[in-house]
Amino acid sequence: MAFSKLGAAITLDVQEEVFNWLCDANRPIEVQDFTSPNMLNSDFSDLVLKYKDKLKSHTGTKGLHGPFFGLDLGNQETEFQKLISKRLLTALDICEQLSSEYMVIHSPFNEWMNLNKRQYPHVQSSTISAMGDILELPLKRASEIGCTLVLENCDDTDPNMRLSAIQDINHPNLKLSIDTGHAHLSHSNYKAPSVVDFISAAEGYLAHVHLQDVDGYADRHWLPGEGSITWPAVVDALKICSTKPHLIIEVRKNMHRIPNSINYLESLFQI
């Protein structure tokens, strides 16, 4: 099966040569400058204008990482839910201005919920219900601007919890995202399923993948091949994925190596 063109997550200060390399081939670009706490409560119009100018020649897929610090999508307090929805709506306004096809949001599920499914059987359903309330207006807005919200695993150890949330909320603009590093951390520390199993569990709903490597100890955001993830197996799992998800390298340093890393992954897709 044909795979999506690989791209990268960037901030405005990314090296010009890397940005130009992405733009020259119209590779997907994911903007990550709008995630800091309280940022969406300030005047960010200049930053949006800078991005619009920087991206004016880019015709590839554009995405945005939405805000997540302190914004628990499973929060059951009504007043907090309103604030979280407001933050997501503000981020979606930015998506509209930058023509973003998707926005990444973080999953509220974790190992405590997984371990206590029988002890506290209402927790998962209550979390999904809260998600539905929080995302109701953002999903309406997303559908109006042609944007998809993609729910990324963060502390998840049971990939079926996110799947159940997507299925229960049942909105065409809500899909799944997988962060390979997060999945490998859960596998290494909590004996959660491996990255390839996270991918297979998302089949039919997977719209986006953050490709990053880790050592199994911390959320390193290293380039693929620099940690302990078995990349040929991950690529094999993505090859048979029917949904053709956006494939985004998400790293924190050594951005100048992104072209080589993309070439490496693309070589695996060709095997």
Report residues per predicted region.
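Active-site acidic/histidine proton-transfer and metal-coordination neighborhood
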Residues: 74-175
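N-terminal pre-domain/capping segments
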Residues: 1-92, 96, 270-271
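Short, flexible/disordered intra-domain loops and linkers
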Residues: 38-43, 117-122, 188-193, 220-223
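Alpha-helix-loop-beta-strand connector modules within alpha/beta enzyme cores
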Residues: 51-69, 128-144, 231-237
